Amino acid sequence: MKHKILIGSLIVTLFAFILYTSNIKRVENAQLKIVEPNNSKVAKNKKKTKGPKVKKLEKPKEPKVNSIEYSNHVKAQKGSNQKLVKQIKKVMGIDDSFQVVAQDLTNSSHFAVVSNTNKAHDAGKTMRLFLLIALYEQEQKGKMGSRTAIKISKKDKAKGDKMFQVGITYGVSYLRSAMLKGNKTAASALTRKIGVNNIDQVAKKMGATQTKVNSNMTGQTTANDLAKTMIGLYQGRVLNRQYASRVLATLAKERPSLVSGLSGGIYAIGDDDFAVAIVQTNGRAYCMSVWSTQH
């Protein structure tokens, strides 16, 4: 519980800082009105600017240390906003291994990718983000729909699960809702229907190159991969706008406690060690992805 509070506190703190620095930058770039005795002029920056593009998140290089990953070997991706980097280091401290990605989705230059390890780590419920995207990709291709039903097999049934019965058929929507609430039987049935390889392929198409999905919907991923995936949804990668909106709407309903301190339009998923979210507020959007574990 203490660890979940730490990650939740980190997300709230960093989002507040991102909003603060974004507002400061916006004020600095604003047009300045010069008041003179008889007239007024507006000083404009004549340099043409292109529309914002989200900067491609690169894979940070692994610190050159021995077999142990030392928490003080913190690396920031080239181009990272130094104010954000400083704040991330301050919040994370030196006692944990961590990966943090923060990206302003309306300003490509305002981002930070900071970590002391770039390895993929075990994830729980967060891995279901990839299953959710794969489900909607199947619908987008016409291979599944609202009338699709799946019969629960003995292999699907999780020990102690009283929600689903072997041999009974359930609709995809019902299974999807149960899966997102943590039901292992539903996750197994949906994974079997789609196929682990197809889910892995969807992850790769979203840019999650270090992610590996297991048959029981656990697996390994990174904060960077999760950020790429959420940003991909926001940009309409793999899923068109209609189906990407459905995924985000689903994530808005299943808001984890880790982001309970945030306000605005929030699309998030998380577990004990990972959390990823997109927050829309005041006409802007931000993505935050975090992995942290206590030694």
PLM feature spans:
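Active-site SXXK
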Residues: 121-150
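Active-site-adjacent helix/loop patches that line small-molecule binding or acyl-intermediate pockets
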Residues: 65-84, 165-239
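Active-site-proximal loop and beta-strand segments within enzyme catalytic domains
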Residues: 140-172
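A conserved catalytic-loop motif detector
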Residues: 219-268
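Sec-dependent N-terminal signal peptides of Gram-positive bacterial secreted proteins and lipoproteins
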Residues: 1-26
